[in-house]
């Protein structure tokens, strides 16, 4: 009885592992094949990455950070075709017509813009030229230049906006400071201007700005800090400060500006 059972156990023992091996052999081979396939895919994925990095010219240093070469300077920058229309008030049409021969050369020669005066719409039209215009901010500079002239500034003062980048124009009204009407408004404007414009000229010379009095509107052209100093002097005159006190403050302001510059 022992021998047959032993033989059966051996057969079962031999048969059992053979079935498992038979069932597991393909799986083991598939696993091996899968491993090989996965390795091949990884290698194929890494190869394009390396080729992309090599094509892009990325060089890694010792710490693994990329090293980039110096950027190449572009000789010319492309500017999109844009246009701008600046309206001209009726009272500035005659000065614009008389000074037109001096207005368009800086726009055409310096900023490389196309300019024309539209008499029907009473606007100055500016347009960039894709081939000749190189400065992206040329159109804005030209519009600011024309706008300054239409506000009442002299031509030389307006051209300064094209040459200097730190010049601004600030506009405010007398009623923004204090609500005045009738004779009170006229007296406030007279205090700002002074006799024969002496007070206005004193503020301009002390703060290195340019001021235009257009009815109840006040336009100030200059640097940021200079505009603030001129605005403080004008506001104090509107509020009723005597001109003598304002002159004293202007002297201190002028001395500070001399120390700075």
From Swiss-Prot:
Residues 1-29 are annotated as: Disordered. Pfam families: KH_PNO1_2nd. The keyword Transmembrane helix does not apply. One of its GO terms (molecular function) is RNA binding. SUPFAM superfamilies: Eukaryotic type KH-domain (KH-domain type I). The keyword RNA-binding applies. GO terms for biological process: ribosome biogenesis. InterPro entries: KH-I_PNO1_first (IPR055212), KH_dom (IPR004087), KH_dom_type_1_sf (IPR036612), KH_PNO1_2nd (IPR055211). Disulfide bonds: none annotated. It is found in: Cytoplasm; Nucleus, Nucleolus. Coiled coil: none annotated. Residues 182-234 form the KH domain. Transmembrane segments: none annotated. GO terms for cellular component: cytoplasm; nucleolus. Gene3D superfamilies: K Homology domain, type 1. Keywords: Cytoplasm, Nucleus, Ribosome biogenesis, RNA-binding. Belongs to the PNO1 family. Component of the small ribosomal subunit, ribosomal RNA processing complex (SSU RRP complex). Required for small ribosomal subunit (SSU) synthesis. Has a role in the processing of early nucleolar and late cytoplasmic pre-RNA species. This is Pre-rRNA-processing protein PNO1. It comes from Candida glabrata (strain ATCC 2001 / BCRC 20586 / JCM 3761 / NBRC 0622 / NRRL Y-65 / CBS 138). The gene is PNO1.
């Amino acid at each position: 009885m022992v021998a047959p059972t032993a033989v059966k156990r051996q057969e079962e023992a031999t048969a059992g592992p053979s079935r498992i091996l038979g069932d597991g052999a393909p799986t083991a081979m598939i696993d091996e094949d899968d491993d090989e396939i996965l390795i091949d895919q990884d290698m194929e994925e890494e190869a394009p990455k390396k080729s992309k990095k090599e094509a892009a010219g990325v060089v890694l240093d010792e710490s693994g950070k990329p090293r980039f070469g110096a950027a190449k300077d572009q000789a010319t920058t492309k500017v999109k075709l844009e246009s701008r229309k600046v309206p001209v008030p009726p009272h500035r049409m005659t000065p614009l017509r008389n000074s037109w021969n001096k207005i368009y050369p800086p726009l055409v020669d310096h900023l490389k813009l196309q300019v024309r005066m539209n008499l029907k719409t009473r606007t100055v039209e500016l347009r960039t030229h894709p081939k000749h215009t190189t400065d992206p901010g040329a159109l804005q500079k030209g519009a600011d230049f024309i706008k300054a002239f239409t506000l009442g500034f002299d031509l030389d003062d307006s051209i300064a906006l094209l040459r200097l980048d730190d010049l601004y124009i600030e506009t405010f009204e007398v009623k923004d400071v204090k609500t005045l009407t009738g004779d009170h408004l006229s007296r406030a404007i007279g205090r700002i201007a002074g006799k024969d414009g002496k007070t206005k000229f004193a503020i301009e010379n002390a703060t290195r700005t340019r001021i235009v009095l257009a009815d109840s509107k006040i336009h100030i052209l200059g640097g940021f800090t200079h505009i603030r100093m001129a605005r403080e002097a004008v506001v104090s005159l509107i509020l009723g400060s005597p001109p003598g006190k304002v002159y004293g403050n202007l002297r201190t302001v002028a001395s500070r500006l001399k120390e700075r510059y």
